């Protein structure tokens, strides 16, 4: 740059100005009162199993975040007089004795806000789905006080799950805490995921919290929600079994804080905690490692308080606070169905009801395997839709009476027509509440089904056809509603119109007739039982049809054996299968054996000692048939001379029968 003619003058002015600035700065420093600022630095005394014992930080707060040299973080779990037990939130690599520790002055917080929707994060808000880091502009502490009584409102709105047995018998309200409890592998997570998937058409934000689960199981849950539900309105907080115990411990608290962000803004949220049994085991592990005194089943004394202060955060807020709600579906696992264990009894007493899943019902292919006698909702009809409450009035009583009658009739038959009708009705109810996964029903579908059941429209229907009825009902109702709605008519609340609901329920009879006609047409067309059931009834009808086909194949096999073997062996085979087939099948087998021997079937002597079936029971025992066979004439296959033998006790026929009976007994 070429200097200007006034450059010497400008340089002299800058020198004077710089000297003045330096003098002013020195004067300012002379007037500053310097005070020493000290930062407490603690030291690690020992570390083991994810717990570090730190000294030198006497002013540390409970749940305060501490930062170790090297970047590892943890939170203060217990505060003793000399040592602080710090639960590490990261792998403890690099943390050893004499490692420096510093306070941060902040408690554990988690990011919250709309940016979490559709994301998979850990309890600290760190992404696990490979996406971009979250904006931490808004955070909430993981430990927050539950709403006060004056801040709450009554639970009066239903949280629709789409599962008929839950919505009809054990209604869950917005702001309620309903425990899902049962043995391992009884469908607890499946029931909770069905509730999440059904919110795809509602305004509920869902938060799924996985604690100590296998990574593969968590991945299946996420894939199911992404395929059938609305993942853009869900948040997945994952603390798998491989992560640090500290992350597993704070996971449910972080999930509730994320859901509270939406509740406090007048929205509705649902939290599924899977599961609190593993969380209790993690709390026990941390308590034993930090030398807390153990109590019942080695759990510390504050385990009830830990879960109570967590679940009390679920509530329906008053209208003055926006009217938002936070519902909770905690999951707990029992051991051999023991509901009287420590953790199950604690959770049952904390929550507003429980849905008990039974392993025997699950093994009997009843899904969901809800035990009607042990399950309860303490909110129930207060949050149920009026139309659904009216339609399901006697459902639970009728089903409970059916279960009692079914257990009683296993020891004998029924002669009362009224009891037989009650058994038939109970079988229809059981088929109706057996619902496949991801086949949610609308409230209108549930009301119409229950009204049709109460009107007797399903009494003449085979239980195998209930599954196709449930599958085809939504489309059928949509078509009927379109036909009943005038052109350019305003939107109509069909659930509030009793006459319209009755008309829709009556139309179900026509749908049942069509389904039965389709089934009959497929049967007459010779379609295999598996294919017909698959087209009509889905998986459940298919299994029933496969069972019928297997029984038909057994009867056919018995007849083929009777045709191919010798007369003596035919009599022995017929005697052996007489306990398993009906009296008619025995007569067919005898006729076939006579035809093989060259004798007309019409001349065969009737089998007077065939086993008689009890009324709704099995045939008489084999021993009764054997004793009767010694005092009756038996059809022989050796010609007319043998058929006209004067005495069944002697001759060749008696010898053959005695030899066959001896071989059978041996």
UniProtKB/Swiss-Prot annotation:
The keyword Cell inner membrane applies. Pfam families: ATP-synt_ab (PF00006), ATP-synt_ab_C (PF00306), ATP-synt_ab_N (PF02874). GO terms for cellular component: plasma membrane; proton-transporting ATP synthase complex. It is found in: Cell inner membrane. The record marks 375 as: Required for activity. ATP binds at residues 182-189. It comes from the Bacteria. GO terms for molecular function: ADP binding; ATP binding; proton-transporting ATP synthase activity, rotational mechanism. The keyword Zinc does not apply. Residues 545-590, 623-641 have a biased composition (Basic and acidic residues). InterPro entries: ATP_synth_asu-like_sf, ATP_synth_asu_C, ATP_synth_asu_C_sf, ATP_synth_F1_a_nt-bd_dom, ATP_synth_F1_asu, ATPase_a/bsu_AS, ATPase_F1/V1/A1_a/bsu_N, ATPase_F1/V1/A1_a/bsu_N_sf. Its EC number is 7.1.2.2. Residues 591-601 have a biased composition (Low complexity). Residues 527-666 are annotated as: Disordered. Keywords: ATP synthesis, ATP-binding, Cell inner membrane, Cell membrane, CF(1), Hydrogen ion transport, Ion transport, Membrane, Nucleotide-binding, Translocase, Transport. It is a peripheral membrane protein. It catalyses: ATP + H2O + 4 H(+)(in) = ADP + phosphate + 5 H(+)(out). F-type ATPases have 2 components, CF(1) - the catalytic core - and CF(0) - the membrane proton channel. CF(1) has five subunits: alpha(3), beta(3), gamma(1), delta(1), epsilon(1). CF(0) has three main subunits: a(1), b(2) and c(9-12). The alpha and beta chains form an alternating ring which encloses part of the gamma chain. CF(1) is attached to CF(0) by a central stalk formed by the gamma and epsilon chains, while a peripheral stalk is formed by the delta and b chains. Produces ATP from ADP in the presence of a proton gradient across the membrane. The alpha chain is a regulatory subunit. Belongs to the ATPase alpha/beta chains family. This is ATP synthase subunit alpha 2.
């Amino acid at each position: 740059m070429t200097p200007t003619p006034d450059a010497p003058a400008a340089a002299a002015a800058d020198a004077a100005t710089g000297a003045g600035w330096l003098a002013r700065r020195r004067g300012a420093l002379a007037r500053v009162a310097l005070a020493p600022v000290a930062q407490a630095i603690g030291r690690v005394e020992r570390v083991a199993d994810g717990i570090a014992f730190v000294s030198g930080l006497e002013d540390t707060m409970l749940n305060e975040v501490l930062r170790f040299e090297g970047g590892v973080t943890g939170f203060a779990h217990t505060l003793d007089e000399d040592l602080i037990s710090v639960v590490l939130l990261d792998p403890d690599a690099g943390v050893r004795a004499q490692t420096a520790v510093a306070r941060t002055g902040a408690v554990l917080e988690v990011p919250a806000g709309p940016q979490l929707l559709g994301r998979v994060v850990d309890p600290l808000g760190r992404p696990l789905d490979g996406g971009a880091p979250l904006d931490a502009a808004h955070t909430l502490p993981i430990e927050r006080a539950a709403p006060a009584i004056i801040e709450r409102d009554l639970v009066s709105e239903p949280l629709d799950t789409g599962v008929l047995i839950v919505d009809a018998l054990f209604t869950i309200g917005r702001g309620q805490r309903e425990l899902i409890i049962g043995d391992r592998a009884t469908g607890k997570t499946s029931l909770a995921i069905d509730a999440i998937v059904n919110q795809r058409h509602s305004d509920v934000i869902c938060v799924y919290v996985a604690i100590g689960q296998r990574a593969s199981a968590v991945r299946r849950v996420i894939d199911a929600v992404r395929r059938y539900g609305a993942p853009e309105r869900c948040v997945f907080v994952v603390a798998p079994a491989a992560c640090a115990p500290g992350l597993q411990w704070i996971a449910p608290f972080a999930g509730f804080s994320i859901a509270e962000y939406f509740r406090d803004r007048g929205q509705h949220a649902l939290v599924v905690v899977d599961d609190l049994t593993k969380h209790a085991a993690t709390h026990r592990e941390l308590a034993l490692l930090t030398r807390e005194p153990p109590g019942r089943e080695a759990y510390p004394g504050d385990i009830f308080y830990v879960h109570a202060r967590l679940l009390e955060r679920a509530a329906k807020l008053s209208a003055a606070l926006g009217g938002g709600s936070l519902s909770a579906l905690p999951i707990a696992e029992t051991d051999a169905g023991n509901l009287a264990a420590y953790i199950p009894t604690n959770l049952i007493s904390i929550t507003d009801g429980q849905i008990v899943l039974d392993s025997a019902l699950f093994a009997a292919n009843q899904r969901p395997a809800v035990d009607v006698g042990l399950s309860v909702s303490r909110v129930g009809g207060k949050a149920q839709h009026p139309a659904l409450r009216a339609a399901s009035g006697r459902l639970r009583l009728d089903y409970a009476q059916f279960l009692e009658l079914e257990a009683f009739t296993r020891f004998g038959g029924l002669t009362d027509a009224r009891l037989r009708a009650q058994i038939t009705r109970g079988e229809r109810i059981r088929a109706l509440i057996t619902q496949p996964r991801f086949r949610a029903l609308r409230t209108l579908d549930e009301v119409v089904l229950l009204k049709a059941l109460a009107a007797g429209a399903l009494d003449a229907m085979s239980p195998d056809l209930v599954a196709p009825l449930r599958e085809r009902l939504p489309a059928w109702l949509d078509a009927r509603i379109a036909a009943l709605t005038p052109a350019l008519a305003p939107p109509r609340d069909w659930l509030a119109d009793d006459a319209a609901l009755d008309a829709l329920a009556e139309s179900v009879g026509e749908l049942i007739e069509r389904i039965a006609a389709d089934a009959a047409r497929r049967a007459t067309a010779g379609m295999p039982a598996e294919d017909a059931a698959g087209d009509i009834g889905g998986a459940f009808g298919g299994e029933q049809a496969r069972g019928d086909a297997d029984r038909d194949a057994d009867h056919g096999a018995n007849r083929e054996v009777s045709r191919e073997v010798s007369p003596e062996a035919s009599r022995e085979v017929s005697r052996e299968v007489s306990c398993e087939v009906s009296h008619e099948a025995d007569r067919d087998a005898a006729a076939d054996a006579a035809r093989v021997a060259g004798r007309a079937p019409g001349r065969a002597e009737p089998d007077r000692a065939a086993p008689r079936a009890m009324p709704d029971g099995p045939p008489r025992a084999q021993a009764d048939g054997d004793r009767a066979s010694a005092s009756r004439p038996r059809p022989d296959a050796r010609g007319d001379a043998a058929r006209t033998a004067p005495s069944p006790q002697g001759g060749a026929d008696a010898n053959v029968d005695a030899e066959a009976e001896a071989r059978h007994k041996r």
